[in-house]
Amino acid sequence: MENHMKVVAFERQQQGTGASRRLRNAGKTTGIVYGGEAAPQMIELDHNALWHALKKEAFHSSILDLEVAGKSQRVLLRDVQYHPFRQLVLHVDFQRIDPKKKLHTKVPLHFLNAESSPAVKLSSAVVSHVVTEIEVECLPADLPEFLEVDLSKIEAGQSLHAKDIVLPNGVALTPHVDAENPVVASATIPAGAVSEEAAAGEGETPAA
C-alpha cells in the first residue's frame, strides 16, 4: 500500500502511574513504540485525535506513518487499552515494521453478496458471519486493508471456511489458521421457517 495514515506523537519523558494520570488530565494518551533494532520509545498522543482515528477500520489493520519528534517510522497498531466504562483510551502499543520481513497481523473481512445467494433467495436462510477478521502473513507492501468474502454461491446448510477466501498475491493465511481452516460464515434456515414448512406438509390431505 502506497498511502499510509499519518499519526503524530510526542516523546514522553515522564513515566509511572502519576505521570500517566497527569497526561490524561491534559488530554493526552500514553503509548510505546517497539520492535526492530531500535530501543522501545515512550510516546504521548493527543487523546481526541487518537479516539477518532481508532474509529476507522484501517487504523487497526493498515501500516501507519508514525511521526515522533519530526522523524517518521512505519508501524502497526498492536494493542489498545480502554477505560472499562469511560470513553477513554488509556494506552496504545505500536510495533515497528521491516519492509523486507513478513509480518503476521489480523485483517478485517468484508462480506458481500449474501442477499443474492441461493441460501437467502431460495431457502430464506440466515447467513451468519462467524468471524470478522482473519490472521494473514505477508510483506508490509502487500498488506491488504481488508479481505472480501463472496457469499453469492453459499447454499442453506453450507459454511465457508478460511481457505475459501480469495487472497491477493503475496498474502497467505498464517500456518495455524491454514491448518485449522476455521468457519468464517454459515447459512442456516431459522427454526421457525423449518417448522412452517413441516406444518405445511402435515396440513396436506392425502388423496383418497
Curated annotation (Swiss-Prot):
<protein>
    <recommendedName>
        <fullName>Large ribosomal subunit protein bL25</fullName>
    </recommendedName>
</protein>
<dbReference type="Pfam" id="PF01386">
    <property type="entry name" value="Ribosomal_L25p"/>
</dbReference>
<dbReference type="GO" id="GO:0006412">
    <property type="term" value="P:translation"/>
</dbReference>
<dbReference type="InterPro" id="IPR020057">
    <property type="entry name" value="Ribosomal_bL25_b-dom"/>
</dbReference>
<dbReference type="InterPro" id="IPR037121">
    <property type="entry name" value="Ribosomal_bL25_C"/>
</dbReference>
<dbReference type="Pfam" id="PF14693">
    <property type="entry name" value="Ribosomal_TL5_C"/>
</dbReference>
<dbReference type="InterPro" id="IPR011035">
    <property type="entry name" value="Ribosomal_bL25/Gln-tRNA_synth"/>
</dbReference>
<dbReference type="InterPro" id="IPR001021">
    <property type="entry name" value="Ribosomal_bL25_long"/>
</dbReference>
<keyword id="KW-0689">Ribosomal protein</keyword>
<keyword id="KW-0699">rRNA-binding</keyword>
<dbReference type="InterPro" id="IPR029751">
    <property type="entry name" value="Ribosomal_L25_dom"/>
</dbReference>
<dbReference type="GO" id="GO:0008097">
    <property type="term" value="F:5S rRNA binding"/>
</dbReference>
<comment type="function">
    <text>This is one of the proteins that binds to the 5S RNA in the ribosome where it forms part of the central protuberance.</text>
</comment>
<comment type="similarity">
    <text>Belongs to the bacterial ribosomal protein bL25 family. CTC subfamily.</text>
</comment>
<dbReference type="InterPro" id="IPR020056">
    <property type="entry name" value="Rbsml_bL25/Gln-tRNA_synth_N"/>
</dbReference>
<dbReference type="GO" id="GO:0022625">
    <property type="term" value="C:cytosolic large ribosomal subunit"/>
</dbReference>
<dbReference type="GO" id="GO:0003735">
    <property type="term" value="F:structural constituent of ribosome"/>
</dbReference>
<keyword id="KW-0687">Ribonucleoprotein</keyword>
<keyword id="KW-0694">RNA-binding</keyword>
<comment type="subunit">
    <text>Part of the 50S ribosomal subunit; part of the 5S rRNA/L5/L18/L25 subcomplex. Contacts the 5S rRNA. Binds to the 5S rRNA independently of L5 and L18.</text>
</comment>
<dbReference type="InterPro" id="IPR020930">
    <property type="entry name" value="Ribosomal_uL5_bac-type"/>
</dbReference>
